[in-house]
Regions:
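Extracellular beta-strand elements of beta-rich domains used
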Residues: 137, 241, 250, 314-316
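Disordered, acidic Ser/Thr/Pro-rich linker "stalks" and the adjacent N-terminal cap
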Residues: 157-243, 255-258, 279, 285, ...
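Extracellular and analogous surface-interaction loops
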Residues: 48, 237-246, 292-296
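Short, conserved beta-strand segments of beta-strand-rich sandwich/propeller modules, principally
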Residues: 115, 249, 297-301
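A short beta-strand element within beta-rich, extracytoplasmic domains
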Residues: 245-257, 302
């Protein structure tokens, strides 16, 4: 983070903070521990300034009870922080919206329009999904942050969408070599993290089930995915467009993209006779992977040769 005078600061886990040199290459001065109203392990801090107030956001707990709390200061990025009036934990799980454990993230803002967006991860199940969420922040007249209820609506495009083509996958049908069995998670969520009830009645038992149906790859939702069975040695996902139509390219958003994938794509007009279409032979880490088709086809079949056997999204243009 940098202040209006150009001074840069670094904030990191366990509430550590320090001033940086002008070239942003080194720390300078003393390393301090940020003062917070609540204790406990914390990581992924955020510092930003709005209307003369410095905000220090820090995380607490974890798993399904991951939360974000904050402190306020009118002095400097490293001093004068006090607990805000009212609830200092402003973001926590929403059972109604099916968002569990909203964790650390960052604030993006436009000072001219006073638009502030908090982008964060969801703990999800087992800490392995960690999908990215975004919600708009709102403030009270005194500068305190209003409680942010997490949801899957997002904030929409902040500019005109660069993609104007029709996604043919939305009207297609999907099938697969196998489908992973549904996974049900049962947890207890603290519904009043700012002031938990002593009798623990604010702890609510909830459960949710993830279904890995092939059609999830074509619903244009980054919250659902297709997964093959763990013992599927040759996983594939096939799409039927209903009739032969011109396809320019396909975009694949694989599960665990940072681990990389190798794959090959086939095309067909009868679902029986297949021809090679595109491939990535060596494991490549990126998202999305793009396959050039440039042909009139009805069926497409994606074989995952290496990498996690799952797909968040398959877009077809």
């Amino acid at each position: 983070s940098s202040d209006l005078d150009g001074t840069a600061y670094l904030f990191w886990r366990r509430r550590m903070a320090a001033r940086m040199t002008d070239d942003w290459q080194h720390l300078t001065g003393d390393t301090i521990v940020m003062s917070t109203a609540r204790q406990g392990y914390s990581e992924g801090p955020v510092m930003f300034k709005r209307k003369g107030i410095y905000y220090y956001i820090y995380t607490l707990r974890g798993n399904q009870n991951y939360v974000n709390a904050y402190m306020m200061s009118r002095q400097s990025p490293l001093s004068g922080f006090e607990k805000p009036e009212g609830n200092d934990i402003f973001l926590f799980s929403s059972i109604a919206n099916n968002v569990w454990g909203p964790g650390h993230g960052n604030v993006f803002y436009n000072e001219e329009t006073d638009d502030y967006i908090f982008v964060y991860l969801e703990y999800g199940d087992g800490g392995t999904t960690r999908q990215v969420y975004a919600n708009r922040m709102e403030f009270n007249e005194d500068g305190t942050i209003k409680t942010l209820v997490p949801d899957e609506k997002g904030v929409g495009y902040l500019a005109v969408s660069q993609e104007q083509r029709e996604n043919k996958a939305l009207k297609a049908s999907f099938s697969a070599s196998s489908v992973r069995s549904p996974r049900t998670s049962k947890v207890e969520i603290e519904t009043q993290p700012n002031c938990p009830l002593a009798d623990k009645t604010s702890l609510v038992k909830v459960e949710r089930t993830h279904i890995y149906h092939p059609g999830n790859a074509g619903d244009q939702s980054n919250g659902t995915r297709w997964m093959a069975e763990t013992n599927d040695d040759h996983p594939w996902l096939m799409v039927d467009l209903g009739e032969a139509m011109q396809v320019t390219e396909c975009q694949f958003a694989f599960v665990h993209p940072a681990e990389g994938h190798a794959w090959h794509l086939e095309k067909s007009n009868d679902g029986t006779n297949w021809q090679p279409c595109a491939e990535v032979k060596e494991v490549k880490a990126c998202s999305p992977h793009v396959a050039t088709v440039g042909d009139k086809v009805r069926y497409l079949r994606l074989h995952i040769d290496k990498g996690a056997a799952g797909l968040w999204e398959w877009k077809i243009y």
